[in-house]
């Protein structure tokens, strides 16, 4: 029972820290372009301005 006196504030502190980190990520734009990374994987990189060399 005495351990709950320590564990409950620790759990609430970690939850609050996670919430602050999530809100910071939202504010800094980490979730703005969710589809961009999946499309960049499929891009072969043969766009303008890039030199394509064959070996």
Curated annotation (Swiss-Prot):
Any one Pfam family here would be FixS
The keyword Transmembrane helix appears for this protein: yes
Chain ranges passing through the membrane = 4-24
Question: Could you name the Gene Ontology cellular component terms for this entry?
Answer: plasma membrane
Record keywords: Cell membrane, Membrane, Nitrogen fixation, Plasmid, Transmembrane, Transmembrane helix
Q: Which InterPro entries match?
A: Cyt_oxidase_maturation_cbb3 (IPR004714)
Q: What PANTHER family does the record tag this protein with?
A: FIXS PROTEIN (PTHR41532:SF1)
* Name recorded for this polypeptide: Nitrogen fixation protein FixS
Organism name: Rhizobium meliloti (strain 1021) (Ensifer meliloti)
């Amino acid at each position: 029972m005495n351990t709950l006196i320590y564990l409950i504030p620790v759990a609430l502190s970690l939850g609050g820290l996670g919430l602050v980190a999530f809100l910071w990520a939202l504010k800094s734009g980490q979730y703005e372009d969710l589809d961009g990374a999946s499309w960049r994987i499929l891009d072969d990189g043969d766009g303008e301005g890039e030199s394509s060399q064959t070996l």
